[in-house]
Amino acid sequence: MPPRIAVFTKNKVNPGYEAARVGAERAAERLAASVTHYVPERPDNVEEQIELVNRALGERPDAVLFVPVHETAVNDAIREFDAAGIPLFNMIARTTAGKRICFVGSDDRALGFNIACHLFQTICGRGEIAILEGTPASPTSRDRLAGFHDALARFPDIKVRMSLRGEYLRTVARQAYTEAADRPHAVDAVLCANDHMALWVLDALDALGAEKLPVIVGVNAVPEAIAAIETGRMLATAHFDTMAMSAIATEAAVRFLNGESVPSEIMLPVQIVDAENYARWNCPFDARPCPTWHEVVAR
């Protein structure tokens, strides 16, 4: 019987998690496995993810791929996989409970540092910026913000006018940016912890009637952000490759179920995407290449 893998992602609105689901499906098809997706209807909702864990436990998958909606609030539910003897594979954002077999992700602090430095160099190392943070409940948000501040320490003439919580969600980011009291359209640049928020900053600025856009960067290299780079509305994005993370985590699960040893951690490199190289990413998620197991494990 083909391995059955339960895949938990945080929401249905962030394109990064759409990419993760695509990655799991592509890998499962190639490896003769099957995946079932468990996604809260309300984005990042703790109670719903706990309910989904209980549903999955009743369906007895062979392995679980898991992205926690909160760093600690779903820990008791995660431990239920251990109690049921179901191996846990973690991707994108680290779990803080459970006997994780393997984590697949990237260095979010380095990613934040690199995309911030790219932005600061573009505005010649001086000016006023706004920061759009993710959700405090996510370690990726905390680490990216730390990377942003590492970069700020290197550029003393960059001043942060405001740092807003966009919760990694497009509607929240737009509202936060629109309601900011001190003329957000007048900053020189906007540093966003993901593309989903960066795109709503663009929408908010359009609604405010901004005559000139600030320089904007994001993270994830989602297709809509690549289109914005192509038209000059965004400067750059960091390719935090959730599709590859999920595909590699799926393969790790299948290999483990087949009796192979797998690394406890697999870290994927991150590349800055801008007007010089965006063409490689200028396609839908399912048309993008995924790195192979041997390419990432042998690095």
Predicted feature locations:
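Short, hydrophobic alpha-helical segments
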Residues: 57, 119-124, 181, 249, ...
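Hinge/beta->alpha junction and helix N-cap segments in small-molecule ligand-binding domains
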Residues: 8-22, 37-48, 70, 93, ...
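Flexible loop/hinge segments that line or gate small-molecule binding clefts
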Residues: 71-110, 118-121, 128, 220-235
